[in-house]
């Protein structure tokens, strides 16, 4: 490793500072010359003398800069330096004139006077005894902060993280790090178990420390939620804990009991599945146990029926059919009756089974009754599709609940204006694409609905489950506690679409004929990766846009995997090269080894509840503002400004959001996306490359989800053997949830 460069000088001017992450651009005055320095430097103030280590870099727009990796504040050694430091603005209430008077009075002894005899500052004209104490306190606080940063950097803690730690703990940072560094994983965003564990190892915390085991088990439980689980069976938790911590299960069990006593975990038992077996102990992170319990309770409270006679409802439905020239089959009529009669009902069905017609009939029915209806879906794309299909304005669930900026990065701590204290003012709420709704969002939605409101949940249970924890739609169906109508009849118009017909064949495990006689379902047999790449580029850039009358950016490539020759990462680099090549008039930005370029199709890859957006009208006038950009949202890079270091992205629904260069890691190219990321979306045409992959991944419902994303055309490129094998593979990853059980228990308790 090459030795770092060192520079020393006075901080002449802070050019820019991001108050959220501490990223700073400053001018450093160094014996007759100035140097632009950059880095995460939240604590540095103008006038300070620093010695910094780092590297010289060349910025495309601003030229030569020095990137600071670590620094040390130097004590000013002479009167000129002291006056410069005190008058820089670093000490609140001390300007240049007052600084000059202080140094004139005490000379090179100024800092010692401030630290040891602060009352003597009152000898200077313009300084009261109170102000003298305030000046001394500020100097002491800055010194303490710098000492803490040096202490933290000694354990390999980066400046930006060190600043967060100090802001959280202040002077207690020394005690906390030496006693229980794992507390940081609980208290500070950005410090996970692995970071805390690395620091603990340097400090010398024992491998079998109680603090370490508890923090490790909490980490395992939280990681499980990222896989969609709400709890873990105790044997699974202990096995994963042992792999992480290298500690015997017996030692972990004691810590687990202590976590339950401290209300950090909840331990319950599930009855044995077979006679003679022991009950299964399961473990939740506390918040998820109570989240499920509360969700079950609210669902039970909504599950009431109206006093009206079913026959009267059916007569009114007949009038609706006649007025709007709708012809409902028996199951569709049953669905509308249940929606009118029940506090909560579930409507499911695959493509072409008439869900949209049924929803339209429900809307007409409720409108005729003079009821206020809200229509929502988990994503902007799904909401837009529902608006177009019904003529009734739909929005995202986050927008319906009025997301505010009073949140942190965790979906568990999102704040909505609409909640139990300020519920939604609606008579009927219809939620589409329910398979995408996780336990967090479901709980937030139910919290904002008062009993007596009708809730209609619409979805396809055969789609992939939500990205977040839980399996809400399936659990509601499994509970058998709510009216459920499953539409299975494929209507004549839909039956003419091979997309619909083949989707149902895939779901039923039936063979799909690949003879390419279809008008909307094609299979191009190709077995060489290089050939497949060329075919994908040709399809997206030339053939499909003309065939389905759409722009190339509206054609979506969906692939099962992120890695590999046909994975998202590789395909996006290839597609970007052909679909949006570099040009002199296109600004670009390096981002984690990839390039983001003006005109690129991009996707938001994590929920950012604090990201501000605006919808712009004619001449750029702002028509609406809001907050929140979510995992899976698609957009186009409209501009990259190297001077302000801002990337502007236009998302669907005309939302413009500005990303700092530091936030660019929230975006990735989206010419190709995983099938999982396409949940709830629909495209004019999709292209699916299939050549092989792990059996646990290449499943029937993954293929079903991919095919049902297309509105006009599906083209699969690759191996027909892989395609047919996926149809035959009905393995589904089991999610550990107990919502269905909680709902049944709630029903039994209140029977």
Map each language-model feature to its residues.
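ASCE P-loop NTPase motor cores of helicases and related translocases
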Residues: 273-428, 477, 483-492, 499-523
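Walker B catalytic acidic pair
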Residues: 433, 459
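C-terminal accessory regions
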Residues: 508, 624-626, 631-751
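Structural detector for short beta-strands of small beta-barrel domains
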Residues: 3-18, 54, 634-638
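Conserved helicase motor core of P-loop NTPases
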Residues: 461-627, 746
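Accessory alpha-helical DNA-binding modules that contact the DNA backbone or grooves
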Residues: 23-32, 36-37, 45-273, 278-280, ...
């Amino acid at each position: 490793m090459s030795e770092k460069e060192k520079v020393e000088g006075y901080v002449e001017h802070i050019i820019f500072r991001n108050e959220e992450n501490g990223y700073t651009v400053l001018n450093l005055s160094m014996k007759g010359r100035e140097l632009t320095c950059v880095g995460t430097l939240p604590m540095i103030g103008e006038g300070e003398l620093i010695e910094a280590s780092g590297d010289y870099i060349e910025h495309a727009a601003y030229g030569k800069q020095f990137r600071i990796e670590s620094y040390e504040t130097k004590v000013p050694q002479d009167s000129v330096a002291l006056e410069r430091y005190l008058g820089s603005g670093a000490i609140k209430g001390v300007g240049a004139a007052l600084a000059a008077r202080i140094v004139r009075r005490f000379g090179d002894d100024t800092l010692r006077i401030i630290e040891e005899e602060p009352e003597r500052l009152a000898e200077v004209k313009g300084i009261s005894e109170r102000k003298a104490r305030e000046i001394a306190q500020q100097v002491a606080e800055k010194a303490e902060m710098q000492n803490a940063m040096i202490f933290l950097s000694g354990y390999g803690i980066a400046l930006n993280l060190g600043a967060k730690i100090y802001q959280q703990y202040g002077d207690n940072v020394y005690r906390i790090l030496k006693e229980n560094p794992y507390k940081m994983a609980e208290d500070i965003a950005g410090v996970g178990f692995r970071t805390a564990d690395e620091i603990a190892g340097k400090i010398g915390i024992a491998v079998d420390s109680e603090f370490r085991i508890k923090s490790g088990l909490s980490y395992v439980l939280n990681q499980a939620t990222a896989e969609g689980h709400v709890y873990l069976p105790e044997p699974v938790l202990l096995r994963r804990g042992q792999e992480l911590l290298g500690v015997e299960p017996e030692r972990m069990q004691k810590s687990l009991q202590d976590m339950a006593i401290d209300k950090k975990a909840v331990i319950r038992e599930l009855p044995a599945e077979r006679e003679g077996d022991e009950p299964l102990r399961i473990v939740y992170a506390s918040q998820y146990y109570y989240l499920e319990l509360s969700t079950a309770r609210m669902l039970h409270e909504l599950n009431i029926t109206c006093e009206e006679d079913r026959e009267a409802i059916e007569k009114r439905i007949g009038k609706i059919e006649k007025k709007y020239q709708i012809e409902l089959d028996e199951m569709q009529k049953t669905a509308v009756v249940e929606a009118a009669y029940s506090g909560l009902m579930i409507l499911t069905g695959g493509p072409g089974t008439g869900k949209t017609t049924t929803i339209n009939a429900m809307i007409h029915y409720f409108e005729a009754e003079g009821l206020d209806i809200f229509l929502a879906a988990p994503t902007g794309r799904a909401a837009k599709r529902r608006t177009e299909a019904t003529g009734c304005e739909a929005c995202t669930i986050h927008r319906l609940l009025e997301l505010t900026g009073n949140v942190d990065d965790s979906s568990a701590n999102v704040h909505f204006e609409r909640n139990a204290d300020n519920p939604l003012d609606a008579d009927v709420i219809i939620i589409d694409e329910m398979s995408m709704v996780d336990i967090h969002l479901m709980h937030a939605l139910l919290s904002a609905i008062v009993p007596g409101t009708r809730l209609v949940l619409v979805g396809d249970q055969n789609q992939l489950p939500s990205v977040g924890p839980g399996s809400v739609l399936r659990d509601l169906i499994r509970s058998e506690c709510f009216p459920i109508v499953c539409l299975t009849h494929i209507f004549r118009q839909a039956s003419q679409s091979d997309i619909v017909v083949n989707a149902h064949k895939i779901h039923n495990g039936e063979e799909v004929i690949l003879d390419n006689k279809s008008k909307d379902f094609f299979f191009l047999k190709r077995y060489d990766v290089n050939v497949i790449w060329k075919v994908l580029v040709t399809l997206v850039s030339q053939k499909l846009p003309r065939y389905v009358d759409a722009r190339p950016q509206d054609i979506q490539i969906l692939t099962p995997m992120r890695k590999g020759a046909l994975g998202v990462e590789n395909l996006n680099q290839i597609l970007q090269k052909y679909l949006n090549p570099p040009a002199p008039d296109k600004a670009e930005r390096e981002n984690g080894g990839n390039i983001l370029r003006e005109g690129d199709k991009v996707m938001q890859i994590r929920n950012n509840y604090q990201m501000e957006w605006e919808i712009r009208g004619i001449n750029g006038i702002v028509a609406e503002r809001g907050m929140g950009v979510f995992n899976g949202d698609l957009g186009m890079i409209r501009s990259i400004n190297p001077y302000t270091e801002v990337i502007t992205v236009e998302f669907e629904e005309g939302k413009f959001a500005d990303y700092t260069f530091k936030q660019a890691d929230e975006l990735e190219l989206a010419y190709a996306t995983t099938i999982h990321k396409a949940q709830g979306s629909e495209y004019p045409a999709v292209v699916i490359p299939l050549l092989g992959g792990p059996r646990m991944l290449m499943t029937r419902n993954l293929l079903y989800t991919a095919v049902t994303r297309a509105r006009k055309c599906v083209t699969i490129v690759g191996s027909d053997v892989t395609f047919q094998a996926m149809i035959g593979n009905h393995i589904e990853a089991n999610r550990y949830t107990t919502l269905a059980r909680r709902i049944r228990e709630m029903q039994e308790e209140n029977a």
